[in-house]
């Protein structure tokens, strides 16, 4: 028995592995936070409350540009418009060395899938972990200055998983005042400015299931110059849910 246990245990090495993986750059490999999917609590409730589908995937696309290690990702989470969003799927994505990549899966499959990190539909963004998915992607709020956030900023952070259901599977709502709006970890990326969705500039550090860290902020909810118009005037005629996400590996 002892021999079998010894053979089953890999020999530890003091040398860092300098290999690339599918979620980050070619850096020293970090310790994984989780490697196996866990059951999503309140699964029936999230399917109903979030209008999840098992027969369709998002038609939205993701476009990436990169400069000095910082990515700007335009994410189409329009889902057919505000009046049709509940009839359409969420868009799922993962952070990789090649940019933010779409994960083409349906909503109910995503409840058992660890390959995605982040999902969006209209003004709601959720992470793969806790009440939202089977993985362990967590978020910690940091300062509002994206450029000032570096690896030292991640010291002693408490990464929180999605926790928008009570033990009785009742939905916890955010502070927006919008009925049925869940208190997701990234919910404070926006606030009402007049009649539109204004961005707050809040920055988070996200911890992926691999242990890699990503600094993340929402630069815009609206396409083109719509966000600047909203933030400064309180209204905009530009299409919403055409996000611009800014992020970088730490």
Model-derived segments and spans:
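Bacterial signal peptide processing site
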Residues: 10-13
């Amino acid at each position: 028995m002892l021999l079998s246990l010894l053979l089953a245990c890999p020999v530890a090495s003091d040398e860092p592995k300098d290999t690339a993986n599918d979620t980050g750059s070619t850096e020293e490999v970090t310790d994984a936070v989780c490697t196996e999917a866990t059951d999503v609590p309140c699964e029936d409730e999230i399917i109903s409350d979030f209008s999840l589908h098992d027969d369709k995937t998002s038609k939205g696309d993701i476009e990436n540009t990169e400069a000095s290690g910082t990515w700007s990702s335009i994410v189409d989470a329009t889902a057919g418009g505000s009046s049709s969003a509940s009839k359409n799927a969420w868009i799922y994505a993962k952070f990789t060395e090649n940019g933010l990549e779409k994960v083409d899966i349906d909503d109910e499959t995503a409840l058992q899938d660890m390959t995605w990190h982040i999902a969006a539909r209209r003004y709601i963004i959720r992470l793969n972990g806790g009440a939202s998915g089977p993985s362990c992607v967590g978020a910690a709020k940091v300062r509002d200055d994206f450029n000032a956030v570096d690896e030292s900023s991640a010291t002693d952070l408490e990464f929180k998983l999605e926790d928008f259901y009570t033990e009785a599977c009742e939905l916890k709502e955010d502070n927006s005042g919008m009925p049925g709006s869940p208190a997701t970890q990234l919910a404070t990326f926006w606030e009402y400015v007049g009649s539109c969705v204004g961005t707050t500039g809040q920055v988070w550090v996200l911890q992926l299931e691999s242990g890699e860290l990503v600094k993340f902020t929402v630069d815009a909810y609206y396409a083109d110059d719509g966000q600047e118009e909203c933030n400064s005037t309180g209204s905009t005629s530009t299409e919403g849910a055409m996000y611009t996400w800014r992020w970088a590996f730490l």
